[in-house]
């Protein structure tokens, strides 16, 4: 569970960021997230998972596949299809903004 100050950091990069829970799993919903150069589309909706999901300590899910990252996969979360890639070992003990930055590195 993220604290208010950590959510505020994420709101600086994605205004309207909020915490959402589904089935005991906590996500940070990022309504608009700018992606690194070369991704298409270059802005997407995202879910940042700050706890283990599918064998990864943290995950970043995107509303659209972006043509970057290795071993892409899709997952049904909150009744929608979300896309991610294999980018592991980003620890949950980082601040959420740091977790987000590390996941975005996987798309560069």
Please identify what each model-predicted range represents.
Residues 6, 42, 56, 96-100:
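Amphipathic alpha-helical interface surfaces
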Residues 1-41:
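Strand-helix-loop interaction patch of compact alpha/beta domains
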Residues 30-77:
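Compact alpha/beta protein-protein interaction domains typified by the UBC
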Residues 3-4, 49, 95:
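General structural signal for secondary-structure boundaries
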Residues 61, 71-108:
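Glycine-centered motif in EGF-like
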